[in-house]
Amino acid sequence: MANLKDIRDRIVSVKNTRKITEAMRLVAAAKVRRAQEQVLRSRPFADRLARVLENIQSRMSFEMADAPLLKTSDLKTITLLAVTGDRGLCGGYNSNIIKRTEQRYAELNGQGYKVDLVLIGRKAITYFSNRSSQYTIRATFTGLEQVPTSDDAESITTEVLAEFLSQSTDRIEVIYTKFINLVSCNPVVQTLLPLDPQGIAEADDEIFRLTTKDSRLTVEKGVGPANEQPPLPSDIIFEQSPEQLLNALLPLYLQNQMLRALQESAASELASRMTAMNNASDNAKALAKTLTLDYNKARQAAITQEILEVVGGSCS
C-alpha cells in the first residue's frame, strides 16, 4: 500500500485543484450571463435592420439590384471562416469546430472547389498552421475580446469583404458554435457571402437566461423579443433608390451577422468551460473521497501492524 505521506500530499493537491476548477466555473458562469445579455441587447437592432432590408427588397424589381454582395457567380473558390477560442479548458468546444471545418473542407475539395481558410482564435490557427501543407490559410485573427464587440466584427468583415469584392473568392462560409443551452452547443455552417435578402430574420431564435434555482445554476428558456417588435410602417419614404440603400445597408447587415456569430461562439465557449470545470470539480471531489478512504485504510493497516509488532515483542 502507498506511503501515508504520499497519499496525504495527493489529497491536499486534489483539494487545491478542486478550489481552482470551482473558481473557474464561477467565473465562466458570470461571463456566460454577460455574453447572453450582450446578445439580447443587440437583437432589437438586428431585427430592425432585417425588417428594413426586407422592406427595401420588396420594392425592388424582379431583375434585382446591381448589389455586389448579392451577386452569385460560378463557384470556383470558397473561403471557410472558422471561429474558435484562444484558450483551452473548455471541453470539446475548439475540437468540434476544428473537426467540422476539416469535414467541410474535405466535402468541398471532393466536389472540385478550391478552399481557403480564414481562422479566428489561437486554437484553430495553431492546429491548421501545423498542417500548412494540407490547407491554404488566407488570414488569421487573435486577441478578440471575451465579450465580442462591433470592432472585432468590423475587422473580420473588412477582410472577408475585400476578398469577396475583389473576386478572390466566390463564396464565404462561417463555421461557428451556435449556443443552444449550457450543456448543448452545436457547430453550424452558415453562408456569409453572397448575402440572401430572403428570409433574413431567424424565426427559431430563442433566449436562454442563466438563473439560480435551489442554489444551483439553471437555464430558463424564453421567447425572443423579435415578435414584440412592431411592424415597419408601409408608408415609409426613402430618399434614395432601393438599389442605393441596399448597397449601403448590406455591409452593415453583414457586420451584424458576423458579430452575432462571434457572440454565439463566445457564449458557447464560456458555457463549455463552465460545464468542463463543473465536471472537473465533481471528479476532484470523488477522487479526494477515494484517496481519503485509501488513506484511512493505510493508516489503519499501519496501526494494526504496530500493535502486532508490540504484542509479538512482549510475547517473546
UniProtKB/Swiss-Prot annotation:
Q: How does it sit in the membrane?
A: Peripheral membrane protein
GO CC term (a single one)? plasma membrane-derived thylakoid membrane
Q: Does the keyword Ion transport apply?
A: yes
Q: What family is this? A: Belongs to the ATPase gamma chain family.
Q: Which PANTHER family does the entry mention?
A: ATP SYNTHASE GAMMA CHAIN, ATP SYNTHASE GAMMA CHAIN, CHLOROPLASTIC
| Assembly and oligomerization | F-type ATPases have 2 components, CF(1) - the catalytic core - and CF(0) - the membrane proton channel. CF(1) has five subunits: alpha(3), beta(3), gamma(1), delta(1), epsilon(1). CF(0) has three main subunits: a, b and c.
Protein name (Swiss-Prot/TrEMBL) = ATP synthase gamma chain
